């Protein structure tokens, strides 16, 4: 049996890990000890969590947890997006040379991050490009929430048709996966609808 802490970038990732991911991992003997909204700043003695662009605060938060949990049966991972990554993130600027090789770029950044934290139990995960990219694995599942918007559903299908892999939907300011969803469905509630659509799609297809 192993225990796992997940540091999530936002509420969408937190809900996904707390529900769908936790159930899947438990079946394989890995139990999520806690899903923590990752720190992004510390002001006036208070830690502010979720999102943010301060890598230093995020690293300090993770290191603090690794020091508190010294057992060999506990591991640490993350759920953060490649899109809009912190400017001071380890390997951030060097990884630009790999922009044309997105999976290699993510692997390079994960390796750089792991080395920077310096604990073998820390196995970071960076999503290419956003969590919402996973939802494009089967966009038809959005019909449960937007059945009265067939034109929007068709637009989702056309976006996927233009890519070999939903994860390759790019990370531009206006074209990142979440931006496309908000453009098509302005009332899209990402922290609620996102994890529910992911559950409908299923981890096997998302993977």
Model-derived segments and spans:
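C-terminal accessory helical subdomains adjacent to catalytic cores in phosphodiester-
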Residues: 14-44, 59-207
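Non-catalytic terminal and connector segments of soluble metabolic enzymes
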Residues: 48-55
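Catalytic nucleophile-elbow at a beta strand-turn-alpha helix junction centered on a G-D-S/GDSL motif
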Residues: 6-15
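Extreme N-terminal starter segment of soluble prokaryotic enzymes
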Residues: 1-5
């Amino acid at each position: 049996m192993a225990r796992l802490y997940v540091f999530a970038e936002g509420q969408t990732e937190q809900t996904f890990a707390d529900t769908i991911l936790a159930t899947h991992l438990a079946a394989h003997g890995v139990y999520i000890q806690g899903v923590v909204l990752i720190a992004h700043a510390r002001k006036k003695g208070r830690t502010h969590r979720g999102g943010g662009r301060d890598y230093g605060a995020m690293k300090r938060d993770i290191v603090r947890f690794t020091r508190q949990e010294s057992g060999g049966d506990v591991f640490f991972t993350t759920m953060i997006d490649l899109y809009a990554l912190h400017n001071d993130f380890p390997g951030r600027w060097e990884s630009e040379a790999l922009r044309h090789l997105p999976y290699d770029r993510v692997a390079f950044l994960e390796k750089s991050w792991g080395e920077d934290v310096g604990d073998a139990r820390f196995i970071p995960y960076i999503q290419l490009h956003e969590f919402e990219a996973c939802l494009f694995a089967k966009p038809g599942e959005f019909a449960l929430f937007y059945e009265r918007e067939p034109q929007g559903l068709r637009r989702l299908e056309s976006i996927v048709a233009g890519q070999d892999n939903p994860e390759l939907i790019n990370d531009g300011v206006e074209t990142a996966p979440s931006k496309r969803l908000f453009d098509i469905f302005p009332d899209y509630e990402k922290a609620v609808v996102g994890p529910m659509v992911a559950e409908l799609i299923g981890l096997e297809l998302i993977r």
